[in-house]
């Protein structure tokens, strides 16, 4: 009988802990977290929570098969971390840079167009998931890519060691 009471008390404590601490452990989508660079001139934009969540959904739909967790399966040395995006030519660490890339992708050094091998609006005939994406959708996806490092830290683009 005592064992049953102890297990019941433990289960009750775990349930209470989950209800009280569950939301405290979740990432807060504050305006600071949702504020990301708009362009390379230093302007910023604050996404709405709805934009961020839509970007996350669209990223899962159109991008995550190759970029799950911010990595690049086809080229592990190029991830979606902010630092990596900033070093690209042209820089892709802002909304406009990422949207431009999703329209017409180029190599990391910016020398060659790679629309034939990387999904983009330009190659929507080859990559059907890109067909129905609008400019608004691309902004939401770019916003998601730029917000994730603020939420996940080193896990975003960190690879297998974090999953």
From Swiss-Prot:
It comes from Thermosynechococcus vestitus (strain NIES-2133 / IAM M-273 / BP-1). Disulfide bonds: none annotated. This is Photosystem II extrinsic protein V. Disruption phenotype: Cells do not grow photoautotrophically under low CO(2) concentrations. It comes from the Bacteria. Gene3D superfamilies: Cytochrome c-like domain. The gene is psbV. The keyword Membrane applies. Belongs to the cytochrome c family. PsbV subfamily. Pfam families: Cytochrom_C550 (PF14495). Binds 1 heme c group covalently per subunit. PSII binds multiple chlorophylls, carotenoids and specific lipids. PSII is composed of 1 copy each of membrane proteins PsbA, PsbB, PsbC, PsbD, PsbE, PsbF, PsbH, PsbI, PsbJ, PsbK, PsbL, PsbM, PsbT, PsbX, PsbY, PsbZ, Psb30/Ycf12, peripheral proteins PsbO, CyanoQ (PsbQ), PsbU, PsbV and a large number of cofactors. It forms dimeric complexes. Its cofactor is heme c. GO terms for cellular component: photosystem II; plasma membrane-derived thylakoid membrane. Its main location: membrane. It is found in: Cellular thylakoid membrane.
């Amino acid at each position: 009988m005592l064992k049953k009471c102890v297990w019941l008390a433990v289960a009750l404590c775990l349930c209470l802990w989950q209800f009280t601490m569950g939301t405290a452990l979740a990432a807060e989508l504050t305006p600071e977290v949702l504020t990301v660079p708009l362009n390379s001139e230093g302007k910023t934009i604050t996404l709405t929570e709805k934009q961020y969540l839509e970007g996350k959904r669209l990223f899962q739909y159109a991008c995550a098969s190759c970029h799950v967790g911010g990595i690049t399966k086809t080229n592990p040395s190029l991830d979606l971390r902010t630092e990596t995006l900033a070093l690209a030519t042209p820089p892709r660490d802002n909304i406009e840079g990422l949207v431009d890339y999703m329209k017409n992708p180029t190599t990391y050094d910016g020398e060659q167009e790679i629309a034939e091998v990387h999904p983009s609006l330009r190659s929507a005939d080859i990559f059907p998931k890109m067909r129905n994406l609008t400019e608004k959708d691309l902004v939401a996806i770019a916003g998601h890519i730029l917000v994730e490092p603020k939420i996940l830290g080193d896990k975003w683009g960190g690879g297998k060691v974090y999953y």
